[in-house]
Amino acid sequence: MGIEQKYDVAIVGGGLAGLGLAIQCARMGYRTVLFEKESYPFHKVCGEYVSLESWNFLQDLGLPLSDMQLPIINRLLITTPNGNYLETPLPLGGFGISRYTLDQQLAAIARQEGVTILEETKVTNVIYRNNSFLVFSGKGETEARVVAGAYGKRGNLDVKWKRQFTQVKPNKLNHYVAVKYHIRTHHAADLIALHNFENGYCGISQIEENKYCLCYLTTAANLRNSRNDISIMEKDILMKNPFLERIFSNAEWLYEEPLAISRISFNKKSQVENHVLMIGDTAGLITPLCGNGMSMALHSSKLAFEEIHSFLQGTSNRFEMEIQYTQQWEKYFGRRLQAGRWLQRFFGNTRSSNLLIKTVKPFPKFVSFLIQQTHGKPF
Protein backbone atom coordinates (compact mmCIF):
# COMPACT_ATOMS: atom_id res chain seq x y z
CA MET A 1 0.00 0.00 0.00
CA GLY A 2 1.23 3.51 -0.79
CA ILE A 3 1.18 6.56 1.44
CA GLU A 4 -2.28 7.98 1.96
CA GLN A 5 -3.21 11.67 1.85
CA LYS A 6 -1.09 13.92 4.06
CA TYR A 7 -2.86 15.26 7.14
CA ASP A 8 -2.05 18.12 9.48
CA VAL A 9 -3.02 16.09 12.54
CA ALA A 10 -3.31 12.32 13.11
CA ILE A 11 -4.86 11.06 16.35
CA VAL A 12 -4.38 7.49 17.56
CA GLY A 13 -7.46 6.55 19.61
CA GLY A 14 -11.02 7.80 19.58
CA GLY A 15 -12.01 8.18 23.22
CA LEU A 16 -12.87 11.50 24.86
CA ALA A 17 -9.40 13.03 24.49
CA GLY A 18 -8.98 11.93 20.87
CA LEU A 19 -12.45 13.01 19.76
CA GLY A 20 -12.21 16.30 21.67
CA LEU A 21 -8.91 17.13 19.97
CA ALA A 22 -10.17 16.04 16.53
CA ILE A 23 -13.21 18.34 16.70
CA GLN A 24 -11.11 21.35 17.76
CA CYS A 25 -8.51 20.75 15.00
CA ALA A 26 -11.09 20.25 12.24
CA ARG A 27 -12.95 23.42 13.27
CA MET A 28 -9.78 25.42 12.67
CA GLY A 29 -9.55 23.96 9.18
CA TYR A 30 -6.78 21.44 9.86
CA ARG A 31 -6.95 18.17 7.92
CA THR A 32 -7.49 15.66 10.70
CA VAL A 33 -7.56 11.86 10.75
CA LEU A 34 -8.50 9.73 13.76
CA PHE A 35 -7.75 5.99 14.11
CA GLU A 36 -10.04 3.90 16.34
CA LYS A 37 -9.57 0.15 16.74
CA GLU A 38 -13.23 -0.43 17.69
CA SER A 39 -16.42 0.58 15.88
CA TYR A 40 -18.82 3.20 17.34
CA PRO A 41 -20.87 2.89 19.47
CA PHE A 42 -19.20 0.60 22.01
CA HIS A 43 -19.04 0.15 25.78
CA LYS A 44 -15.89 0.99 27.75
CA VAL A 45 -14.69 0.27 31.26
CA CYS A 46 -15.24 3.67 32.87
CA GLY A 47 -16.98 5.10 35.93
CA GLU A 48 -19.13 7.31 33.65
CA TYR A 49 -19.21 10.21 36.09
CA VAL A 50 -18.12 13.52 34.51
CA SER A 51 -17.10 16.45 36.71
CA LEU A 52 -19.10 19.61 35.95
CA GLU A 53 -15.82 21.38 35.15
CA SER A 54 -16.26 19.88 31.62
CA TRP A 55 -19.89 20.91 31.05
CA ASN A 56 -19.21 24.16 29.12
CA PHE A 57 -16.40 22.62 27.08
CA LEU A 58 -18.62 19.71 25.97
CA GLN A 59 -21.42 22.12 25.06
CA ASP A 60 -18.91 24.18 23.04
CA LEU A 61 -17.89 21.01 21.19
CA GLY A 62 -21.54 20.73 20.13
CA LEU A 63 -22.99 18.28 22.65
CA PRO A 64 -26.52 19.40 23.69
CA LEU A 65 -26.07 18.42 27.35
CA SER A 66 -28.84 20.73 28.60
CA ASP A 67 -31.40 18.88 26.45
CA MET A 68 -30.27 15.36 27.40
CA GLN A 69 -31.96 15.09 30.83
CA LEU A 70 -28.84 13.70 32.46
CA PRO A 71 -28.62 13.09 36.22
CA ILE A 72 -26.80 15.89 38.06
CA ILE A 73 -24.78 14.38 40.90
CA ASN A 74 -23.90 16.54 43.91
CA ARG A 75 -23.53 14.14 46.87
CA LEU A 76 -20.86 11.56 47.70
CA LEU A 77 -21.21 8.49 49.92
CA ILE A 78 -18.07 6.60 51.02
CA THR A 79 -18.43 3.27 52.83
CA THR A 80 -15.85 1.00 54.49
CA PRO A 81 -15.74 -2.80 54.06
CA ASN A 82 -17.47 -3.28 57.41
CA GLY A 83 -20.26 -0.77 56.69
CA ASN A 84 -19.13 2.51 58.26
CA TYR A 85 -19.92 5.47 56.03
CA LEU A 86 -19.52 9.17 55.34
CA GLU A 87 -21.86 11.29 53.24
CA THR A 88 -20.79 14.71 51.99
CA PRO A 89 -21.82 17.32 49.41
CA LEU A 90 -19.61 17.46 46.30
CA PRO A 91 -18.09 20.98 45.96
CA LEU A 92 -18.55 21.16 42.17
CA GLY A 93 -20.49 17.99 41.39
CA GLY A 94 -20.88 16.18 38.12
CA PHE A 95 -23.25 14.38 35.79
CA GLY A 96 -23.70 10.82 34.61
CA ILE A 97 -23.55 9.65 30.98
CA SER A 98 -22.42 6.36 29.45
CA ARG A 99 -19.37 6.22 27.20
CA TYR A 100 -21.56 4.33 24.71
CA THR A 101 -23.66 7.49 24.25
CA LEU A 102 -21.00 10.15 24.83
CA ASP A 103 -18.33 8.78 22.48
CA GLN A 104 -20.87 8.03 19.75
CA GLN A 105 -22.22 11.58 19.84
CA LEU A 106 -18.76 13.14 19.82
CA ALA A 107 -17.76 10.90 16.88
CA ALA A 108 -20.84 12.12 14.96
CA ILE A 109 -19.86 15.76 15.65
CA ALA A 110 -16.27 15.05 14.54
CA ARG A 111 -17.51 13.61 11.25
CA GLN A 112 -19.76 16.63 10.66
CA GLU A 113 -16.73 18.88 11.20
CA GLY A 114 -14.82 16.97 8.51
CA VAL A 115 -12.63 14.61 10.55
CA THR A 116 -11.68 11.40 8.72
CA ILE A 117 -12.51 8.65 11.24
CA LEU A 118 -11.00 5.24 10.45
CA GLU A 119 -12.86 2.70 12.59
CA GLU A 120 -11.73 -0.89 13.21
CA THR A 121 -8.22 0.35 12.40
CA LYS A 122 -5.35 -0.56 14.69
CA VAL A 123 -2.20 1.55 14.55
CA THR A 124 0.90 -0.65 14.67
CA ASN A 125 3.62 2.00 14.66
CA VAL A 126 4.31 5.73 14.42
CA ILE A 127 7.66 6.88 13.03
CA TYR A 128 9.00 10.45 13.14
CA ARG A 129 11.43 11.58 10.46
CA ASN A 130 12.20 14.79 8.55
CA ASN A 131 9.85 16.88 10.74
CA SER A 132 6.89 14.66 9.80
CA PHE A 133 5.27 11.40 10.88
CA LEU A 134 4.35 8.13 9.22
CA VAL A 135 1.46 6.31 10.91
CA PHE A 136 1.30 2.59 10.09
CA SER A 137 -2.09 0.90 10.37
CA GLY A 138 -4.27 -1.77 8.82
CA LYS A 139 -5.27 0.87 6.26
CA GLY A 140 -1.69 1.46 5.07
CA GLU A 141 0.64 4.38 5.76
CA THR A 142 -0.61 7.86 6.61
CA GLU A 143 1.55 10.97 6.74
CA ALA A 144 0.90 13.77 9.24
CA ARG A 145 2.65 16.87 10.58
CA VAL A 146 1.52 16.26 14.18
CA VAL A 147 0.50 13.03 15.93
CA ALA A 148 -1.37 12.72 19.25
CA GLY A 149 -1.59 9.49 21.25
CA ALA A 150 -5.06 9.08 22.77
CA TYR A 151 -5.32 5.29 22.95
CA GLY A 152 -6.07 4.94 26.65
CA LYS A 153 -4.48 3.34 29.67
CA ARG A 154 -2.16 0.87 27.95
CA GLY A 155 -1.68 0.13 24.25
CA ASN A 156 0.56 -1.82 21.90
CA LEU A 157 2.51 1.38 21.14
CA ASP A 158 3.42 1.75 24.84
CA VAL A 159 5.05 -1.68 24.76
CA LYS A 160 6.65 -1.11 21.34
CA TRP A 161 8.19 2.18 22.50
CA LYS A 162 9.18 0.62 25.86
CA ARG A 163 7.49 3.48 27.73
CA GLN A 164 8.84 3.55 31.23
CA PHE A 165 5.63 2.52 33.03
CA THR A 166 5.55 -0.75 30.99
CA GLN A 167 9.06 -1.67 32.17
CA VAL A 168 8.29 -1.48 35.91
CA LYS A 169 7.88 -4.71 37.87
CA PRO A 170 4.38 -5.31 39.33
CA ASN A 171 3.87 -3.09 42.39
CA LYS A 172 1.14 -1.31 44.36
CA LEU A 173 0.63 1.29 41.63
CA ASN A 174 0.57 -0.79 38.48
CA HIS A 175 -1.18 -4.12 38.89
CA TYR A 176 -4.92 -3.47 38.88
CA VAL A 177 -7.99 -4.82 37.14
CA ALA A 178 -11.27 -2.97 36.58
CA VAL A 179 -14.75 -4.38 36.00
CA LYS A 180 -17.89 -2.58 34.84
CA TYR A 181 -21.63 -3.30 34.60
CA HIS A 182 -24.76 -1.37 33.74
CA ILE A 183 -27.56 -2.16 36.17
CA ARG A 184 -30.96 -1.01 37.38
CA THR A 185 -31.20 -0.54 41.13
CA HIS A 186 -32.65 1.67 43.87
CA HIS A 187 -30.13 4.47 44.36
CA ALA A 188 -30.60 8.25 44.59
CA ALA A 189 -30.03 9.97 41.23
CA ASP A 190 -27.96 12.79 42.78
CA LEU A 191 -25.61 10.48 44.71
CA ILE A 192 -22.34 8.83 43.70
CA ALA A 193 -21.20 6.10 46.09
CA LEU A 194 -17.71 4.67 46.62
CA HIS A 195 -17.90 1.35 48.44
CA ASN A 196 -14.65 -0.06 49.82
CA PHE A 197 -13.85 -3.76 49.98
CA GLU A 198 -10.62 -5.62 50.72
CA ASN A 199 -8.01 -4.46 48.14
CA GLY A 200 -10.42 -2.41 46.07
CA TYR A 201 -13.39 -0.08 45.80
CA CYS A 202 -16.56 0.12 43.75
CA GLY A 203 -18.30 3.22 42.38
CA ILE A 204 -21.98 3.45 41.52
CA SER A 205 -23.89 6.37 40.01
CA GLN A 206 -26.75 7.05 37.64
CA ILE A 207 -26.31 7.54 33.88
CA GLU A 208 -28.91 8.20 31.16
CA GLU A 209 -32.28 6.35 30.89
CA ASN A 210 -32.43 5.64 34.63
CA LYS A 211 -29.60 3.10 34.34
CA TYR A 212 -26.62 2.91 36.70
CA CYS A 213 -22.95 2.38 36.10
CA LEU A 214 -21.30 0.05 38.60
CA CYS A 215 -17.53 -0.04 38.16
CA TYR A 216 -14.87 -1.35 40.49
CA LEU A 217 -11.09 -1.42 40.74
CA THR A 218 -9.17 -4.16 42.51
CA THR A 219 -5.76 -5.80 42.57
CA ALA A 220 -4.81 -8.56 40.15
CA ALA A 221 -3.98 -10.63 43.26
CA ASN A 222 -7.62 -10.43 44.45
CA LEU A 223 -8.77 -11.96 41.17
CA ARG A 224 -5.99 -14.56 41.16
CA ASN A 225 -6.94 -15.63 44.69
CA SER A 226 -10.54 -16.08 43.49
CA ARG A 227 -9.50 -18.66 40.86
CA ASN A 228 -9.55 -15.85 38.24
CA ASP A 229 -13.34 -15.92 38.46
CA ILE A 230 -15.01 -12.50 38.72
CA SER A 231 -18.26 -13.85 40.20
CA ILE A 232 -16.39 -15.78 42.93
CA MET A 233 -14.43 -12.63 43.79
CA GLU A 234 -17.63 -10.56 43.98
CA LYS A 235 -19.32 -13.11 46.24
CA ASP A 236 -16.34 -13.75 48.54
CA ILE A 237 -14.78 -10.28 48.72
CA LEU A 238 -16.97 -7.42 47.45
CA MET A 239 -20.19 -8.60 49.10
CA LYS A 240 -18.61 -8.55 52.54
CA ASN A 241 -19.42 -4.82 52.43
CA PRO A 242 -23.13 -4.72 53.45
CA PHE A 243 -23.85 -1.89 50.98
CA LEU A 244 -22.42 -3.92 48.09
CA GLU A 245 -24.15 -7.06 49.31
CA ARG A 246 -27.49 -5.23 49.01
CA ILE A 247 -26.71 -3.94 45.50
CA PHE A 248 -25.39 -7.25 44.14
CA SER A 249 -28.32 -9.20 45.61
CA ASN A 250 -31.12 -6.94 44.33
CA ALA A 251 -29.93 -5.27 41.10
CA GLU A 252 -31.15 -6.03 37.59
CA TRP A 253 -28.03 -6.76 35.51
CA LEU A 254 -28.15 -5.33 31.99
CA TYR A 255 -25.01 -7.02 30.58
CA GLU A 256 -24.71 -10.72 29.83
CA GLU A 257 -21.06 -10.51 30.90
CA PRO A 258 -19.12 -7.80 32.72
CA LEU A 259 -16.61 -5.64 30.85
CA ALA A 260 -13.12 -6.03 32.30
CA ILE A 261 -9.62 -4.66 31.71
CA SER A 262 -6.33 -5.54 33.39
CA ARG A 263 -2.74 -4.29 33.81
CA ILE A 264 -3.87 -0.82 34.87
CA SER A 265 -0.96 1.36 36.00
CA PHE A 266 -1.00 4.56 38.06
CA ASN A 267 2.76 5.04 37.68
CA LYS A 268 3.93 8.34 36.20
CA LYS A 269 3.92 8.58 32.40
CA SER A 270 5.61 10.93 29.94
CA GLN A 271 3.47 13.49 28.12
CA VAL A 272 5.57 13.35 24.94
CA GLU A 273 7.03 10.16 23.48
CA ASN A 274 8.96 10.07 20.18
CA HIS A 275 7.55 13.56 19.43
CA VAL A 276 3.97 12.24 19.82
CA LEU A 277 1.84 14.34 22.22
CA MET A 278 0.09 12.09 24.74
CA ILE A 279 -3.41 13.07 25.88
CA GLY A 280 -6.04 11.59 28.20
CA ASP A 281 -5.15 8.38 30.06
CA THR A 282 -2.22 7.87 27.67
CA ALA A 283 -0.48 10.83 29.36
CA GLY A 284 -1.28 9.88 32.94
CA LEU A 285 -4.00 7.99 34.78
CA ILE A 286 -5.72 9.50 37.82
CA THR A 287 -7.02 7.05 40.42
CA PRO A 288 -10.72 6.37 39.71
CA LEU A 289 -11.84 7.31 43.24
CA CYS A 290 -11.23 10.95 42.19
CA GLY A 291 -13.98 10.84 39.54
CA ASN A 292 -11.90 13.13 37.34
CA GLY A 293 -10.51 10.97 34.52
CA MET A 294 -13.07 11.99 31.88
CA SER A 295 -12.68 15.70 32.60
CA MET A 296 -8.90 15.39 32.53
CA ALA A 297 -9.11 13.69 29.13
CA LEU A 298 -11.23 16.52 27.72
CA HIS A 299 -9.12 19.25 29.33
CA SER A 300 -5.88 17.68 28.04
CA SER A 301 -7.33 17.74 24.51
CA LYS A 302 -7.84 21.50 24.90
CA LEU A 303 -4.29 22.04 26.19
CA ALA A 304 -2.85 19.94 23.35
CA PHE A 305 -4.94 21.76 20.75
CA GLU A 306 -3.65 25.16 21.89
CA GLU A 307 -0.02 24.05 21.41
CA ILE A 308 -0.70 22.20 18.13
CA HIS A 309 -2.50 25.27 16.76
CA SER A 310 0.52 27.50 17.59
CA PHE A 311 2.85 25.02 15.89
CA LEU A 312 0.75 24.65 12.73
CA GLN A 313 0.41 28.44 12.53
CA GLY A 314 4.20 28.74 12.66
CA THR A 315 4.29 30.73 15.91
CA SER A 316 6.19 27.94 17.72
CA ASN A 317 8.54 25.17 16.63
CA ARG A 318 8.17 21.48 17.50
CA PHE A 319 10.49 21.66 20.50
CA GLU A 320 8.56 24.63 21.93
CA MET A 321 5.22 22.86 21.33
CA GLU A 322 6.40 19.76 23.21
CA ILE A 323 7.89 21.71 26.15
CA GLN A 324 4.86 24.01 26.44
CA TYR A 325 2.41 21.10 26.37
CA THR A 326 4.37 19.16 29.02
CA GLN A 327 4.51 22.24 31.28
CA GLN A 328 0.79 22.99 30.86
CA TRP A 329 -0.11 19.35 31.53
CA GLU A 330 1.98 19.33 34.70
CA LYS A 331 0.54 22.68 35.83
CA TYR A 332 -3.08 21.51 35.56
CA PHE A 333 -2.82 17.80 36.39
CA GLY A 334 0.43 17.03 38.25
CA ARG A 335 -0.85 17.79 41.75
CA ARG A 336 -4.20 16.19 41.01
CA LEU A 337 -2.59 12.85 40.15
CA GLN A 338 -0.36 13.03 43.23
CA ALA A 339 -3.37 13.73 45.48
CA GLY A 340 -5.24 10.82 43.89
CA ARG A 341 -2.37 8.38 44.46
CA TRP A 342 -2.11 9.53 48.08
CA LEU A 343 -5.85 9.23 48.74
CA GLN A 344 -6.02 5.76 47.18
CA ARG A 345 -3.74 4.48 49.97
CA PHE A 346 -6.69 4.85 52.37
CA PHE A 347 -9.04 2.89 50.13
CA GLY A 348 -9.40 -0.87 49.80
CA ASN A 349 -8.40 -1.63 53.37
CA THR A 350 -10.75 -1.95 56.34
CA ARG A 351 -8.43 -0.34 58.88
CA SER A 352 -7.24 2.61 56.76
CA SER A 353 -10.67 3.43 55.24
CA ASN A 354 -12.23 3.37 58.74
CA LEU A 355 -9.41 5.59 59.99
CA LEU A 356 -9.93 8.06 57.13
CA ILE A 357 -13.69 8.30 57.68
CA LYS A 358 -13.39 8.55 61.47
CA THR A 359 -10.75 11.30 61.14
CA VAL A 360 -12.44 13.50 58.54
CA LYS A 361 -16.14 13.00 59.42
CA PRO A 362 -16.24 15.82 62.02
CA PHE A 363 -14.57 18.25 59.55
CA PRO A 364 -16.80 18.75 56.49
CA LYS A 365 -14.69 21.68 55.26
CA PHE A 366 -11.60 19.47 55.25
CA VAL A 367 -13.50 16.78 53.31
CA SER A 368 -14.45 19.42 50.77
CA PHE A 369 -10.80 20.54 50.59
CA LEU A 370 -9.62 16.96 49.96
CA ILE A 371 -12.11 16.52 47.10
CA GLN A 372 -11.01 19.83 45.55
CA GLN A 373 -7.38 18.60 45.47
CA THR A 374 -8.39 15.97 42.91
CA HIS A 375 -10.46 18.29 40.68
CA GLY A 376 -9.93 21.39 38.60
CA LYS A 377 -11.94 24.48 37.76
CA PRO A 378 -14.27 24.78 34.73
CA PHE A 379 -12.24 25.18 31.53
Regions found by a protein language model. Give the residues of each.
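Glycine-rich FAD pyrophosphate-binding loop
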Residues: 26-46
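Conserved N-terminal glycine-rich FAD pyrophosphate-binding loop of Rossmann-like flavoproteins
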Residues: 39-59
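C-terminal helical "tail/cap" subdomain of flavin- and related membrane-associated enzymes
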Residues: 306-379
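Conserved Rossmann-like nucleotide-cofactor binding loop
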Residues: 17, 40, 154
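A conserved beta-strand/loop capping segment in the N-terminal third of enzymes
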Residues: 54-105
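FAD/FMN-dependent oxidoreductases across multiple families
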Residues: 125, 141, 224, 228-307
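Predominantly flavin-linked oxidoreductase catalytic cores and closely associated redox partners
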Residues: 109-244
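N-terminal Rossmann-like FAD-binding beta1-loop-alpha1 element of flavoenzymes
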Residues: 7-33
